[in-house]
Amino acid sequence: GDEETRMADTVSGPDQPQGTIGIIGLGIMGGAMAANLVRGGWRVIGYDIDATAREAARHRGVEVVDGPAALAVATSDIILSLPSGEAAIASAETIAAAAPSRAVVLEMSTLSLEDKHAVARALASHGHIALDCPLSGTGAQAQSKDLVVYASGHGPDIERLAPLFLGLGRRYFNLGDYGNATKMKFVANLLVAIHNVASAEAMVLGMKAGLAPQQIVEVIAAGAGTSRVFELRAPLMAENRYEPASMRSSIWQKDMAVIGAFAAQLGCPTPLFSASDAIYRAGLARGLGAQDTASVCAVLEDMAGIRR
């Protein structure tokens, strides 16, 4: 039948109240999105290189296949939620070669613009479409469907996939040209990086002054100085509990490096971002890579001579 009709049917076919979506990368973010989509009535076909992640997804009702090629044959709309540009580009190349008809790949990882464009080129060479759709939110927010999707690329596909975005998040923005969403994500992450260290600095000042950590959280969250980041991270700081991580410091450091390079390339000064970067680096040097990014609080406590 007509290709456009077939694509429309995948979103609201008679058998599927919601349609079919493929997900490559079933880790903290991908696994949570898959679970929410299954709950929302989507048929989710997934793959992850890690056997544990595959098994967890299978338990959540995801149909697990044995690789990106098999996934590309099974569905034409595919999410990539992967830890590196290399993994995303390799998956895009496999999908491009294996997909029997026009595929739409939603690149939802936070990657450099160079990597995002490499993904798009790999797909375009075989007549497929890439959408640049990074997410705003942590792993915990992914679980509670509290994500915001920044979407950019081919407009008609973004509009067609609106139900998908609202099946895994609470809101989405169509930001126009491919790559714009990643630029916006860098702007958002710059603020998250600064707010997280600022939250820790405030907690440490309060604790050093003898205030109760839980009380600092409660009072500051009710006032003008609060932020979404403070509300998510300060409770972890108060409890001095940084595992399991909803955003690992080691992965966050990669995101930080990408933003730093992006700002430098534009010749844009980022004095507060640069200052906060040093605190994250100190955390990694102390071996806190596997811990949540809120662990910058432990670094500042150490510097302040606070023992808990």
For each predicted feature, which ranges?
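NAD(P)+-binding Rossmann beta1-loop-alpha1 motif at the extreme N-terminus of oxidoreductases
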Residues: 4-81, 103, 139
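NAD(P)-dependent dehydrogenase/reductase Rossmann-like domain
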Residues: 9, 285-308
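Rossmann-fold dinucleotide-binding core
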Residues: 21, 111-189
